[in-house]
């Protein structure tokens, strides 16, 4: 059985949230075990549990505009380092086989790929154009670390 760890940017029930729910709902439970770590509690938590996912909530940082300044960058790096280690511990304890970043705003999968040598699937739901430096940085990270990149439309490519 393959254990997949999904990292997502929230726990609401909008587009990317619904895609994640449907994706996990469609997994063959004899072949795959879905683990999801979300940065906050919300309606998605129970919905995912209803379809058999093992869900944890851990307040890890999501790349947002509030981090796009010198103080924000320092805060993000500090928080990222702290929580990425906790997520890696979870991955080891649950014998995770693969990581699935379910948005461009979640970067913690990179840490798991580098430290635990796990394959990384990166699912892109958004088109980030501005600020261009951030767009270029995220695109570089995806190109460098993702084993596969999935987009929801040709526009995301």
Residue locations for each model-derived region?
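Short N-terminal targeting/anchoring amphipathic segment
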Residues: 87-106, 121
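A conserved, positively charged/aromatic
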Residues: 71-72, 121-147
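N-terminal strand-loop element at the rim of the active site
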Residues: 6-14, 26-77
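A short, active-site helix/loop in glycosyltransferases that binds the activated sugar's phosphate group
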Residues: 146-157
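An aromatic- and histidine-rich active-site surface loop
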Residues: 98-116, 131, 139
